[in-house]
Amino acid sequence: GVRVVLFTGNHDMWCYDYLAQECGVEIVRNPRVVEFDGVKVHLAHGDNLNISGQPMLKLMNTIFRASGARTLFSWLVHPDLALKFGLWWSGKSRKSHNKTLMGVDNLRPLVEYAREHNLKNGDVEHYIFGHMHLPHYVREERFEVLFLGDWCGAEAVYATMNDDNNLKLNTFAIDETVS
């Protein structure tokens, strides 16, 4: 089979073990450094990284990620209402991360996170993030930062690494008949 790894982020931080047990999906909740052909790559969803200058977001993420809050929510809120709330919240977030409204400046906190991480761990050559739904490439002196963009919609964005260990953003047109 094909190994499937899901890096949880702001829309799936509450996923428990269903996908792991039923589908064999590996769930990753924190950034991870992996090695491909001797090249170290830092992989992360990107949510909740370098948000120290955003106290309300930090507080909200702390509450949403607390196991007690998740347990209370699952016991006290009917699943139909929880789904409606989740769809509303997701739509609100998606509108704030709209590609036409978001500029490259919004990517700066994650590029700064990569700089700080690279200063401490200088052997990482590539940083790959999702979260912002804006495909973009940043080349720094010692490393590259890649933002994958979306994986759904009219076209999916994915990354490849060539024989020279350089990353490249690619797109794949999604046929509307595929579901």
Please state what every model-predicted region is.
Residues G1-S179:
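Extended recognition/assembly regions associated with phosphoester-bond processing machinery
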